[in-house]
C-alpha cells in the first residue's frame, strides 16, 4: 500500500475545507408577501465562490417600487476592508436605462420604473464587488430578474380577409382553409392561448362549415355544397385568448369561400324533336339551330356542349357546328342528298359536355336522344355525264369524220340517257373534234396534221357541253385524247404563203398556245405551257446589225439637241411679233368637255350586253357559234354553276395585223367554263351589228321622249326670275341702304362696248333717247333746286314752306330703253285672288298680327322689323296691325315690309309709333292694296320732334291713285322724308326729297310727267299671278326702279 500518496491527499483535502469555511459570501433575498404585507429575508450562501441565481420576479404593467429592495448582495471581504458594489446590464447602463439602481455600500438593488414583458421578458444584472483601488474582490455574479406576464395583448389575425375555395359536392370534413392568428403575450401561457369560433355565415340557410377551436382549420360540415344554388359563402370568425374565456381579449376576421363548379349537371337540348324539309342536291349551312341548356358555369368546359349523331347520318350528309359563345349547334348539309336514293331520314342526336361528368352523377347519366325527321323533296335535276370524262386514242391513220365514240348525258331523274339535250363542243384546242348535237357522237373534224400533233404535245383535252333548253341547264364532260404513232402529215394549203403569220387563241378557260410559221422548211421550238399544250416558236435568227446600231446612236444625238432647242423656244412670249399664248377667259369651265361631241355628256352604255344576231346553222353536224341563250344555269347543292358551251364556224378569212386575208379559216373561239346566265360570247371579229345599234339607240330616244311627255309642263310663269334654286327669303328688300357698300369702279375698265351700261350703273347723266311719240312732252332731267326761302310747288299739291334750313327737291326722269314706246297699261288688282299664300306668316281667316321682334337693349339701338303682313279676303282690317312698341331709347329703327291687304278698306293712315328719342328711322316698304283710294297713306306722328329722323316709304301701289305723302309737323333739324317709287293708277312717280331741315309738314311729291309705258312692261304681269310671295321688282342706285319678268 502506498501510504505516502494517501497522506498527501489527506493534507490537501483538509486545506480546501479550511479555505472554504473562511471565504464565505452571503446573499440575502427579500420576500414580500402581497397578501398580508409581511416581509421576510432569506439568506443564501454561495459555496465555492459561486453566486446563487437571483429568483426575484417583477410584474409587467405595475409599480414594483413597493417591493424595493428587490435583492441585496454581500461579500465576505467586507469584514476586513471597504467594499464597493456596482451593477450593469440591460435596464441599467443599456436600454432601457435606469430601471434598476444599487446602493454601493449596502448592496441593495431597487427597481425604479414599470416594465413591459413584451419589450424585455427578463433582465440580467451583472454584480461586482470592488475594493478601494477598484479591483474585483469577487468574480462577477449574474442575477436574472424575470418579468411576470399579464393579458394585455389581443389576438391578431395575419389577414383581414382569408380567401378559400372548394369544389361543390365535396365530402364532409374536407379541409377548406386554415386561419392564422398570434398573441404577443407570453407563449405557452393562458394569456396567449387562442380559441377560434364561427360567429356568422352568409348565406345563412344552414351551416355548411365548421372550424377547429385550437388550430383554426375550416372544414365542410356536409356534402351538400351546390354552386348552382350558392356560388360563394362568407364567414365571420372570432379569435379569443385565455382559451376563449370571458376575461380574454378577442379579434375578428372575414373568410370568403368560393364554390368551384364541377360537371354535375347533365346537358339537354331545348327541343326534344323537330322536323325538316330539304330539297335534293342542295347544300345549306344553316339548316337548324339547336340550343343546348346546361346549368353549370357558363363558358367553362363543364358548360360547353358537344352534339353528336347517334344514328341516321350514315352517309355523312349532315354536320353540326357548335358556337362556344352561345352553346348553340348549327345543323348543316355538307353532302347533297339524292331523292332517288333517300326520301326520308330519321336523325337521332345526343349531347354531352367537353369535360367528364363528376363522380357524383356518373352513375345517373343516361343518353337521351333527340329525334329530327328529315324529308327530302324531289326536284328536276336535268342530265349529267356519267362518267365525267372519257379517253380515246387517235392515230395518224384516222381521217376526216372518223368516229371516235359517243359521250351521252344521263337523266338523273330516270337514270336513262337524256333525250331532251343537245351537245356542243366547249373547249376544243386546234379545232380537232366535232360532236353531233343530237346523238353525242364524237368525230374528227379533219385528219390530224403534224402541226396539230406538235402543238398539242401528244395530248388533247377538251370539254363537251350538254344543254337542256327546256330546263335551262348545262352540264360539262371532259374528253381526253392520246395522239399515238407517227407518220403525221403536214398541213395542206391551196397556195404558198409568203411571209409569216401568227394564230393565237387565248381565253380564261383554256391553256394558251401560239403557233408561228414562216415557211414549210423552218425549224420550230416547242415550249409546254401547262395542261398538255405546248407552244411552238421559230428559232431565233434575228441579229442586231450595224445599221441598227447607227440608228440607235443617231437617236441619242437627237435627244442631246433637245435642251438647246428649248433655249431658243418662245414659251408664251412674242418677242418676234408672235401672238404668244392666248389667255383663257374666265367662266369658261363649261366650254371644254371631256367628250368629242357637242351638247350634253353622252350616257355610258354597257356595250357588252348588246346581243349580236346569230346566223342559223346550215348543217346540224357543224355547230355554229352558240348565242347567249345556249348557256344555262346549273344549281346543285345550293351553289350556282353556270357554264358556257363552245362552238366554231368557218368564216373563210384570217385576221392578221388588222387586215383580212382570204384562204385561211378563222376560228370563232368561245370562252368555256363557268360564267353567268345569258353571258355574251366574245369572237375575235370584234364587230357589232349596225342595224342592232340603230335600233338600240332609237328605242333609247323614244324612251327619253316618252319620259319628257310624262313630266309636268312648265308653260307658266316661274316663281323666281332665275332658273335653278329659288332666291332666299328676304333677298329682295330695301336696297337704298347698301349703295355705299358696292364698289362699281371696275365698270370703268370694261371698254367702249360697256360704256353706256357703266354710265347708267354709276348714275351719270346720259343723253336722252329720241322720242318716237311727239305727243309725249319731254321733261327736263335737270334737278329742281329752289333757293333758300322759296316754295317749290308741285302740281295739285299744297306748297312746301321752309321753316328752318334749306329744302332741296330733286326729280329724275326715266325713259324707256326700247325702240318704241308702248301705251300705258292699267295696273291690275294685285290681290285679285281670294286667299293669299305666302312663304312666311299667313292666315286664312281673322286678323293676323305681324310677328314683331323687339330687342329691348337699354340705352342701345332698337330694331323693330315687321315683314310680309298678309290679311284674308273677307272683312279684314289692317287697323291696329302695325302697332309698334314704345321704343323709349335712342337709335330706333322700324321697318315694315310687304304690307298686303285684300279687297277691303285700307286704313287711311299707317300709324307710326312715338319714337321719342334721337336717330329714329321708320321704313315702310311695298304697301299694296286693291283698287281704292289711299289718302295720305303715310302719316307722320307729330311727336317725332327729335333730331336725325328718317322716314322712307317705298313702292306704294294703289289701284286708283295716290293722294300724297303727308308728314307730321314739328320735325327737328336734320330730318329727311323720302317717298320712293310711288305708283299710282296713271303712272309711276319717282321723287327724292331732302334738305338740311324741315320745319313744317311735307304735303306733296314731285312727279315725273306722263309716263305711259316702257319696253319692259312694268305692270304687264299681274302681281302675284306667278307666285303670291314674289314681288317682281329690282332697285338700283338713286331710287331708279326697273321692273322685269
Curated annotation (Swiss-Prot):
It is found in: Cell membrane; Cell junction, Desmosome; Cytoplasm; Nucleus. InterPro entries: Cadherin-domain_protein, Cadherin-like_dom, Cadherin-like_sf, Cadherin_CS, Cadherin_Y-type_LIR, Catenin-bd_sf, Desmosomal_cadherin. Pfam families: CADH_Y-type_LIR (PF01049), Cadherin (PF00028). One of its GO terms (molecular function) is calcium ion binding. Residues 50-158, 159-270, 271-385, 386-496 form the Cadherin domain. GO terms for biological process: cell-cell adhesion; homophilic cell adhesion via plasma membrane adhesion molecules. Residues 50-546 are extracellular. Residues 24-49 form a propeptide. It is a single-pass type I membrane protein. Desmoglein repeat repeats lie at residues 814-840, 841-870, 871-900, 901-928, 929-957. Its main location: membrane. GO terms for cellular component: cytoplasm; desmosome; nucleus; plasma membrane. Gene3D superfamilies: Cadherins, TCF3-CBD (Catenin binding domain). CDD domains: Cadherin_repeat (cd11304). Keywords: Calcium, Cell adhesion, Cell junction, Cell membrane, Cleavage on pair of basic residues, Cytoplasm, Glycoprotein, Membrane, Metal-binding, Nucleus, Repeat, Signal, Transmembrane, Transmembrane helix. The chain crosses the membrane at residues 547-567. Residues 1019-1045 are annotated as: Disordered. It comes from the Eukaryota. Glycans are attached at residues 36, 110, 180. Binds to JUP/plakoglobin. Interacts with PKP2. Interacts with DSC3; there is evidence to suggest that the interaction promotes cell-cell adhesion of keratinocytes. Component of intercellular desmosome junctions. Involved in the interaction of plaque proteins and intermediate filaments mediating cell-cell adhesion. Three calcium ions are usually bound at the interface of each cadherin domain and rigidify the connections, imparting a strong curvature to the full-length ectodomain. This is Desmoglein-1. It comes from Sus scrofa.
Amino acid at each position: 500500500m502506498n501510504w505516502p500518496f494517501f497522506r498527501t491527499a489527506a493534507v490537501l483535502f483538509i486545506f480546501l475545507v479550511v479555505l472554504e469555511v473562511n471565504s464565505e459570501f452571503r446573499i440575502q433575498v427579500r420576500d414580500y408577501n402581497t397578501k398580508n404585507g409581511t416581509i421576510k429575508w432569506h439568506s443564501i450562501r454561495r459555496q465555492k465562490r459561486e453566486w446563487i441565481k437571483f429568483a426575484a420576479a417583477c410584474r409587467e404593467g405595475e409599480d414594483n417600487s413597493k417591493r424595493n429592495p428587490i435583492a441585496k448582495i454581500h461579500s465576505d471581504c467586507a469584514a476586513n476592508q471597504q467594499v464597493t458594489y456596482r451593477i450593469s446590464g440591460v435596464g441599467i447602463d443599456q436600454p432601457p436605462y435606469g430601471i434598476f439602481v444599487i446602493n454601493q455600500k449596502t448592496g441593495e438593488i431597487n427597481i425604479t420604473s414599470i416594465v413591459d414583458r413584451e419589450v424585455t421578458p427578463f433582465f440580467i444584472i451583472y454584480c461586482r464587488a470592488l475594493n478601494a483601488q477598484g479591483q474585483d474582490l469577487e468574480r462577477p455574479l449574474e442575477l436574472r430578474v424575470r418579468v411576470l406576464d399579464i393579458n394585455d395583448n389581443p389576438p391578431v389575425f395575419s389577414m383581414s380577409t382569408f380567401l378559400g375555395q372548394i369544389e361543390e359536392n365535396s365530402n364532409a370534413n374536407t379541409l377548406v382553409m386554415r386561419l392564422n392568428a398570434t398573441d404577443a403575450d407570453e407563449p405557452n401561457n393562458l394569456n396567449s392561448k387562442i380559441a377560434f369560433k364561427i360567429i356568422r355565415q352568409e348565406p345563412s340557410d344552414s351551416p355548411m362549415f365548421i372550424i377547429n377551436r385550437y388550430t383554426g382549420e375550416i372544414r365542410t360540415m356536409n356534402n351538400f355544397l351546390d354552386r348552382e344554388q350558392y356560388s360563394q359563402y362568407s364567414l365571420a370568425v372570432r379569435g379569443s385568448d385565455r382559451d376563449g374565456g370571458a376575461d380574454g381579449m378577442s379579434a375578428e376576421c372575414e373568410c370568403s369561400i368560393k364554390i368551384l363548379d364541377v360537371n354535375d349537371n347533365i346537358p339537354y337540348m331545348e327541343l326534344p324533336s323537330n322536323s325538316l324539309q330539304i330539297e335534293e342536291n342542295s347544300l345549306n349551312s344553316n339548316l337548324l339551330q339547336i340550343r343546348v341548356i346546361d346549368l353549370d358555369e357558363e363558358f367553362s368546359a363543364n358548360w360547353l356542349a358537344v352534339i353528336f349523331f347517334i344514328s341516321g347520318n350514315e352517309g355523312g350528309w349532315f354536320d353540326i357546328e357548335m358556337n362556344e359563345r352561345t352553346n348553340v349547334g348549327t345543323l348543316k348539309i355538307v353532302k347533297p342528298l339524292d331523292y332517288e336514293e333517300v326520301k326520308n331520314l330519321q336523325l337521332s342526336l345526343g349531347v354531352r359536355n367537353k369535360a367528364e361528368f363528376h363522380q357524383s352523377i356518373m352513375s345517373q347519366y343516361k343518353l337521351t336522344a333527340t329525334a329530327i325527321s328529315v324529308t327530302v323533296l324531289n326536284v328536276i335535276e336535268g342530265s349529267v355525264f356519267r362518267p365525267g370524262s372519257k379517253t380515246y386514242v387517235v392515230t395518224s391513220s384516222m381521217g376526216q369524220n372518223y368516229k371516235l365514240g359517243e359521250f351521252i348525258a344521263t337523266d338523273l331523274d330516270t337514270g336513262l340517257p337524256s333525250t331532251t339535250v343537245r351537245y356542243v363542243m366547249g373547249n376544243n384546242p386546234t379545232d380537232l373534234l366535232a360532236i353531233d348535237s343530237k346523238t353525242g357522237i364524237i368525230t374528227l373534224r379533219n385528219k390530224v396534221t403534224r402541226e396539230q400533233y406538235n402543238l398539242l404535245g401528244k395530248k388533247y383535252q377538251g370539254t363537251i357541253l350538254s344543254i337542256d333548253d327546256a330546263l335551262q341547264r348545262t352540264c360539262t364532260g371532259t374528253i381526253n385524247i392520246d395522239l399515238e404513232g407517227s407518220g403525221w402529215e403536214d398541213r395542206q394549203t391551196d397556195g404558198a404563203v409568203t411571209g409569216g403569220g401568227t394564230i393565237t387563241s387565248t381565253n380564261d378557260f383554256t391553256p394558251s398556245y401560239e403557233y408561228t410559221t414562216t415557211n414549210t422548211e423552218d425549224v420550230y421550238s416547242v415550249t409546254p405551257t401547262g395542261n398538255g399544250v405546248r407552244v411552238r416558236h421559230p428559232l431565233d435568227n434575228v441579229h442586231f446589225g450595224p445599221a441598227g446600231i447607227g440608228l440607235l446612236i443617231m437617236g441619242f444625238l437627237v435627244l442631246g439637241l433637245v435642251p438647246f432647242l428649248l433655249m431658243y423656244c418662245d414659251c408664251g412670249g412674242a418677242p418676234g411679233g408672235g401672238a404668244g399664248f392666248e389667255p383663257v377667259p374666265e367662266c369658261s369651265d363649261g366650254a371644254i368637255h371631256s367628250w368629242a361631241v357637242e351638247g350634253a355628256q353622252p350616257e355610258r352604255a354597257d356595250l357588252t350586253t348588246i346581243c349580236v344576231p346569230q346566223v342559223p346553222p346550215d348543217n346540224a353536224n357543224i355547230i355554229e357559234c352558240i348565242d347567249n341563250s345556249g348557256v344555262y344555269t346549273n344549281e346543285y347543292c345550293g351553289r350556282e354553276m353556270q357554264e358556257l358551251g363552245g362552238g366554231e364556224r368557218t368564216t373563210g378569212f384570217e385576221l392578221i395585223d388588222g387586215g383580212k386575208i382570204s384562204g385561211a379559216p378563222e376560228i370563232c373561239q368561245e370562252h368555256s367554263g363557268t360564267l353567268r346566265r345569258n353571258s355574251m360570247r366574245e369572237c375575235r371579229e370584234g364587230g357589232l351589228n349596225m342595224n342592232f345599234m340603230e335600233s338600240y339607240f332609237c328605242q333609247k330616244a323614244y324612251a327619253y321622249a316618252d319620259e319628257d311627255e310624262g313630266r309636268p309642263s312648265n308653260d307658266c310663269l316661274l316663281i323666281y326670275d332665275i332658273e335653278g334654286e329659288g332666291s332666299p327669303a328676304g333677298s329682295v328688300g330695301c336696297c337704298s341702304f347698301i349703295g355705299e357698300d358696292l364698289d362699281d369702279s371696275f365698270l370703268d375698265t370694261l371698254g367702249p362696248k360697256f360704256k353706256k351700261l357703266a354710265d347708267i350703273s354709276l348714275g351719270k347723266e346720259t343723253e336722252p333717247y329720241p322720242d318716237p311719240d311727239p305727243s309725249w312732252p319731254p321733261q327736263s332731267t335737270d334737278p329742281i333746286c329752289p333757293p333758300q326761302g322759296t316754295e317749290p310747288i308741285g302740281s295739285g299739291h299744297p306748297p312746301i314752306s321752309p321753316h328752318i334750313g334749306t329744302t332741296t327737291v330733286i326729280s329724275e326722269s326715266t325713259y324707256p330703253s326700247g325702240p318704241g314706246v308702248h301705251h300705258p297699261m292699267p295696273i291690275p288688282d294685285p290681290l285679285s285672288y281670294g286667299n293669299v299664300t305666302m312663304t312666311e306668316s299667313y292666315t286664312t281667316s281673322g286678323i293676323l298680327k305681324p310677328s314683331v321682334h323687339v330687342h329691348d337693349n337699354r340705352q342701345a339701338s332698337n330694331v323693330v322689323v315687321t315683314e310680309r303682313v298678309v290679311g284674308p279676303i273677307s272683312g279684314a282690317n289692317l287697323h291696329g296691325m302695325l302697332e309698334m312698341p314704345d321704343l323709349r331709347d335712342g337709335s330706333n329703327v322700324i321697318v315694315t315690309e310687304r304690307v298686303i291687304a285684300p279687297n277691303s278698306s285700307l286704313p287711311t293712315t299707317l300709324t307710326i309709333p312715338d319714337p321719342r328719342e334721337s336717330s329714329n328711322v321708320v321704313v315702310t316698304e311695298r304697301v299694296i292694296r286693291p283698287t281704292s283710294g289711299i289718302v295720305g297713306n303715310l302719316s307722320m306722328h307729330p311727336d317725332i320732334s327729335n333730331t336725325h329722323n328718317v322716314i322712307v316709304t317705298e313702292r306704294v301701289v294703289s289701284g286708283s291713285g295716290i293722294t300724297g305723302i303727308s308728314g307730321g309737323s314739328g320735325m327737328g333739324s336734320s330730318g329727311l322724308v323720302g317717298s320712293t317709287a310711288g305708283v299710282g293708277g296713271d303712272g309711276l312717280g319717282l321723287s327724292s326729297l331732302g334738305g338740311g331741315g324741315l320745319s313744317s309738314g311735307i304735303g306733296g311729291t314731285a312727279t315725273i310727267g306722263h309716263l305711259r309705258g316702257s319696253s319692259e312692261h312694268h305692270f304687264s304681269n299681274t302681281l302675284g299671278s306667278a307666285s303670291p310671295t314674289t314681288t317682281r321688282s329690282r332697285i338700283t342706285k338713286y331710287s331708279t326702279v326697273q321692273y322685269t319678268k
